[in-house]
C-alpha cells in the first residue's frame, strides 16, 4: 500500500464509519490532470446503499479533504456501493468470498501472466489461492493490483 493511500484511508475511514457505514475500500487513480478518488461504502441494512447515502458521505469526505488537502491538483470524488462485481481490498474481504469466482490483475507478471480469473480457494498467510482451469496458484496479496468478485447468475 502506498503512503498516499494510507494517508487518504486514515482521513476517510473515520468519516465513513462515523456516518454509520462500513468503509469497504478505495481507489486513487492519478491520471494526469484527471485524477479520481473512488470510495466504496457498505452497510448491514437491508435497504443497501442509496444515492442519498453516497451524497452524504461525499459531502463529509469532501469537507475533510478540502481542509487537509492530501491530494495535489484537481480530482473527481466518487462514492458508491461496491456493487455485485465488488472489488476486494483486504484479507477479510477475500476470506468472505472464498468459493466465489474472482478476477485478479497483478502489478507484475506471475508465472508469465498478469490476469487470472478463477475460483477463490482460500488464503494462506498473506497469499491468495485461486484455481484457474484445474490448476491452483498461490499469489502474494502484495502483487494484486485489482481484484473483483465476478457475479454468477
Curated annotation (Swiss-Prot):
Assign the protein's first listed, main location to one coarse class. Answer: cytoplasm
Gene Ontology biological process? ribosomal small subunit assembly; translation
Q: Name one Pfam family in it.
A: RimP_N
Task: Give the location in the cell.
Answer: Cytoplasm
> Gene of origin?
rimP
Protein name, per record:
Ribosome maturation factor RimP
- Annotated signal sequence is none
Recorded hits in HAMAP family, A to Z, give: RimP
Q: List the GO terms this entry assigns under cellular component, sorted alphabetically.
A: cytosol
Family per record: Belongs to the RimP family.
InterPro entries, per the entry: Ribosome_maturation_RimP (IPR003728), RimP_C (IPR028998), RimP_C_sf (IPR036847), RimP_N (IPR028989), RimP_N_sf (IPR035956)
Q: Which organism is it from?
A: Marinomonas sp. (strain MWYL1)
What NCBIfam families does its record include? Answer: PRK00092.1-1
For this UniProt record, give its keywords in alphabetical order, as a comma-separated list: Cytoplasm, Ribosome biogenesis
Q: Where are the transmembrane segments?
A: none
The job of this chain, per UniProt, is described as: Required for maturation of 30S ribosomal subunits.
Amino acid at each position: 500500500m502506498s503512503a498516499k493511500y494510507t494517508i487518504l484511508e486514515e482521513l476517510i475511514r473515520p468519516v465513513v464509519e462515523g456516518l454509520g457505514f462500513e468503509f469497504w475500500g478505495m481507489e486513487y487513480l492519478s491520471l494526469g490532470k484527471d485524477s479520481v478518488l473512488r470510495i466504496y461504502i457498505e452497510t448491514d441494512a437491508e435497504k443497501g446503499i442509496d444515492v442519498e447515502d453516497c451524497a452524504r458521505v461525499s459531502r463529509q469526505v469532501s469537507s475533510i479533504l478540502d481542509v487537509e488537502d492530501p491530494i495535489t491538483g484537481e480530482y473527481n470524488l466518487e462514492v458508491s456501493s461496491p456493487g455485485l462485481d465488488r472489488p476486494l481490498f483486504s484479507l477479510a474481504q477475500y476470506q468472505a468470498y472464498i468459493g466465489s469466482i474472482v478476477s485478479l490483475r497483478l502489478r507484475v507478471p506471475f508465472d508469465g501472466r498478469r490476469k487470472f480469473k478463477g475460483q477463490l480457494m482460500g488464503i494462506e498467510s498473506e497469499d491468495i489461492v485461486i484455481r484457474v482451469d484445474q490448476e491452483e496458484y498461490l499469489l502474494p496479496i502484495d502483487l494484486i493490483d485489482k481484484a473483483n468478485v465476478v457475479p454468477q447468475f
